[in-house]
Amino acid sequence: DLKDRSRGEFWQQQQRRMFVDPAPAAELGDEHAHDAFYMRGRIVYHGNLWLRRDARGKGLAEALTQLGFLVSLLKWSPDYLYGLMAARNAMKGFGIRVGYRRYVPRGTHWIAAPAHIRPDDWLVYSTRNDLIGLARTIVAEGLE
């Protein structure tokens, strides 16, 4: 629950603590996604999903991601559900296919990213109303 600060302010504090302090060569910037500074309240992070190469391209990523969205909606009723997506995947439209409805280039701003962090991520997110709309769409399409 981020009632006292925004997602962007939280990143400025926590990303530095988690990634820069143990990796002194890393340098966190302060030009994070603009929308992150307006996100407050109950916020759920949707992490990475990795599929074996032979399981890709069959709609499984979309189905599993949407299932995660719906479970989070039912369990936590978040104000926002967000993820960080590689720029090339965001520009290919992967986020819209799985259910994200809002996109902002440059999620977190790294001047020098730690080795295991992508420096080109986009903030992708949905509001609670977006998630409710996604649930209605899934139900309507499932009944056809």
Question: How should these model regions be labeled?
Answer:
Residues 7-108, 114:
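Acyl-donor binding region in acyl/amide transferases
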Residues 89-144:
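Charge-rich, low-complexity intrinsically disordered segments
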